[in-house]
């Protein structure tokens, strides 16, 4: 666990453990988790915390779009649009962090 991001690292660890102790496939689990994040209007950090597990489960951008389409009639268009923005902000943050880490390694 990184000492720089202990809360985020703990959430990622919890997510990984919950996948390992679940009876559905990791892919189905992450699809359900994505739907839940959208339904509760989760902030970008929640999507960021779940991104490693979603990637390991093999979720694609088409999967994310499919979940958004499937739940839009239930949770409403505003929630789905907000989720899209939150996901984009989370991805932008992840890219910025990755770029900073690469620059730091290059300076070392």
What spans do the regions from the language model cover?
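Winged helix-turn-helix DNA-binding recognition segment
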Residues: 59-63
């Amino acid at each position: 666990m990184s000492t720089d991001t202990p809360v985020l690292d703990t959430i990622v660890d919890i997510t990984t453990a919950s996948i390992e102790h679940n009876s559905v496939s990791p892919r189905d689990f992450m699809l359900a988790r994505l739907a839940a994040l959208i339904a509760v209007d989760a902030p970008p950090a929640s999507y960021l915390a779940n991104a490693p597990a979603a990637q390991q489960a093999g979720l694609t951008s088409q999967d994310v779009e499919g979940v958004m389409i499937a739940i839009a009639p239930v949770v409403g268009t505003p929630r789905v649009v907000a989720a899209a923005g939150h996901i984009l902000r989370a991805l932008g943050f992840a890219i910025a962090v990755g770029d900073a880490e690469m620059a730091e390694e290059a300076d070392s």
